[in-house]
Regions:
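Conserved active-site/ligand-binding neighborhood in enzyme cores
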Residues: 1-302
């Protein structure tokens, strides 16, 4: 999951990481804390029956795209400029190839067989520049298929509980998308059946951005939508009733949006340790069929 915003890296303390929500002292505030916007975090058992966070950042490099000589894109922007001969179109940060990511697919039981077949046979591509042969992915392993269980967490009345966004959250209200803190808190409180009131001495940590994409069939661009960023953290006071460990609200649930993790404060205090993790690597598979098809097309066109 994207690293929650309560996890920070202390720039003036050799990059040490901590969960500032459970820090009793405030000395860390003077060590230039930085949120880890590009990092991923996962919970794991360190062998002492105590859960902790492992945080890892993917390797990034910059890709530069230039126009092909003689094409329309290679023409000078205006007659007064002498640009040409491979004019640069744009550049973008890209994740290194070969990294292994994991996730969970939730579907109705009767469709599980079809979903598994699709995952195994489909050509998976994510992100931008699909036409430039980037972001090709292959399925490495399906670790297991099991029934979805919804755990309930016991809470005490007035106990602070934290809602951590595991994915971006898009919420509509009266026909428009909203991102203001009060409206988002109202939507989350209604789903959890708790008060919108902020517990004393607590605060939210949230960010917003704009999301977009393309239609699967015709590759038409979807409208851009403002959304609350994954990793945002909201705090509420429990009503004393059991709460689910995970909820999903908002728009685009079929695309994995709006997944929220619920943590009572006593559980949050157990997650004081934050350690450096890693992202597994594998040699990217060579797209032999794609290379052969491109070669044939180039040969014919020549």
């Amino acid at each position: 999951d994207p690293a929650p915003m309560m996890l920070v890296k202390l720039k003036n303390d050799n990059g040490r990481m901590n969960n500032h929500l459970v820090q009793e002292d405030t000395g860390w505030k003077g060590l230039k804390p930085k949120t880890m916007d590009s990092a991923f975090a996962s919970l794991y058992d360190g062998g002492d029956s105590q859960l902790r966070y492992a945080v890892a950042e993917p390797s990034i490099h910059t890709v530069y795209h230039h126009a092909v000589n003689g094409t329309v894109q290679d023409q000078p922007a205006s007659p007064d400029t002498a640009e040409g001969g491979g004019r640069m179109l744009y550049m973008q940060d890209s994740v290194e190839g070969g990294m292994i990511y994991g996730g969970t697919v939730i579907c109705p039981a009767k469709l599980s067989g079809d979903v598994i077949r699709c995952l195994k046979k489909a050509k998976l591509r994510f992100g931008r520049s699909r036409s430039a042969q980037y972001a090709a992915c292959s399925l490495k392993e399906i670790t297991g298929v099991e029934p979805l269980t919804k755990d309930l967490l016991p809470t005490e009345k007035g106990e602070p509980v934290y809602v951590i966004l595991r994915s971006d959250l898009a919420v509509q209200e009266e026909g428009r998308y909203i991102t203001d803190a009060e409206s988002i808190r109202r939507a989350l409180a209604a789903e959890l059946k708790v008060s919108e009131q902020m517990p004393q001495g607590r605060q939210d940590y949230c960010r917003y951005h704009t999301i977009g994409g393309y239609q699967t069939v015709w590759k038409l661009q979807k409208p851009h939508v403002p959304a609350v960023k994954a990793g945002s953290v909201y705090c509420f006071a429990a009503a004393g009733e059991p709460l689910p460990s995970e909820i999903q609200i908002g728009e685009f649930p079929q695309e994995g949006f709006g997944i929220c993790c619920i943590l009572p404060e006593r559980k949050m205090k157990e997650l004081a340790q934050v350690e450096k993790g890693r992202i597994d690597h594998a040699e990217p598979e060579k797209q032999e069929e794609h290379i052969r098809n491109v070669y044939i097309k180039l040969l014919i066109s020549a």
